Amino acid sequence: MVSDYIKSYIERSLEQIRDKLPDKVIQDLREALLNTDINLTESDVDKIIDLAVKDYQESLIEPGEAVGIVSAQSIGEPGTQMTLRTFHFAGIRELNVTLGLPRLIEIVDARKTPSTPIMTIYLTDEYKYDKEKALEIARKIEYTKIENVISSISVDITNMSITIQLDEEMLKDKGVDPSSVKKIISKLKLGKIRIEDIDDYTFTIYFEEIDNISALFKMREKLLNTKIKGIKGIRRAIVQKKGDEYVIITDGSNLEGVIGIKGVDVNKIQTNNIHEIADTFGIEAAREAIAREIKKVLEEQGLDVDMRHILLVADIMTRTGVVRQIGRHGVTGEKSSVLARAAFEVTVKHLLDAAARGEMEEFKGVVENIIIGQPIRLGTGIVELTMRLNVR
């Protein structure tokens, strides 16, 4: 245990280096020093703090370091080793998830919707240890239409009627009863109708105001696509055990809809749809999600890339307050330099547009200076040195 005297000494020592280390590093250092089981002396504290300052300063980049190029090659080179497949979600046969290079391209292209949108929904303490309660929430979330709970539907053009046979197993699986299905149908705007039961799971709907086959088949489509319950976009919700708690994995994503459900832990909910995160929780959350998703994709392929390279990509994609792709319609296409834009793609168009607008090239970046053969402002090129020569 750390004595009270050493605790106060740690606080005083950390206060003295506040200008040398970021607040987060100081906070982590404080927790490590105060929670240790070793009996620390003043000398030990000084050595640990000096070592932390030294390590931090050595980890900083040198002035003029080409961080963009280093990040590009550090992510791009491992990216060449990635697979081009869609995998089954671990332990769940029904769900697929895009991994590897296709997923990385989705992220940096800032696609509006991922090819395999998935959510991981954590539950509050009241629900996460009880499988039945978790299933109850999963049923509330899963988007269910009438076509999902029927075994057959037949159209009788003689009597202008539609007969629906409900699937007992599917009703049980979705947590729906026949009476609620009939109640929903009776509330639809179908004109004047009459519902007659054949048995517990079969009933016929007679349309008394329809007199042509085309209208009857339109009613059939309307019935099949009628929502019974759930959140739009969530095609499937599966309860899975993670450690000692139950979580819900979904096929499909609707962050705004799910966070309103009682029992969902809003602080831990996850989705692989970056734009949904930006719209619901803001751009800072989207930045974190971009970094997390890229890191996850690389780690799944057994590739180790320093988090700082990934954070640079996330920062560039979100610096304007909206999520932008890295490409001609995003970061690269919006560079202030005419020559840099022209060097990337559609050269003639960029040059003509810039000439028509009377744009000025200021030669502040890397590409434009290389094009005209000037030293770039990176590395030693960032230093402007004047020497005074003693001329005799």
Swiss-Prot record:
- Give the first-level EC class, as a single word: transferase
Q: Which GO terms describe its molecular function?
A: DNA binding; DNA-directed RNA polymerase activity
Keyword Transferase listed? The answer is yes
Q: Keyword set for this entry?
A: Cytoplasm, DNA-binding, DNA-directed RNA polymerase, Nucleotidyltransferase, Transcription, Transferase
Q: Where in the cell is it found?
A: Cytoplasm
Q: What reaction(s) does this enzyme catalyze?
A: RNA(n) + a ribonucleoside 5'-triphosphate = RNA(n+1) + diphosphate
Instruction: Cite the record's note on assembly.
Output: Part of the RNA polymerase complex.
Q: What does this protein do?
A: DNA-dependent RNA polymerase (RNAP) catalyzes the transcription of DNA into RNA using the four ribonucleoside triphosphates as substrates. Forms part of the jaw domain.
Q: Which family does it belong to?
A: Belongs to the RNA polymerase beta' chain family.
For this entry, the protein name equals DNA-directed RNA polymerase subunit Rpo1C
Instruction: Please give the organism.
Output: Sulfurisphaera tokodaii (strain DSM 16993 / JCM 10545 / NBRC 100140 / 7)
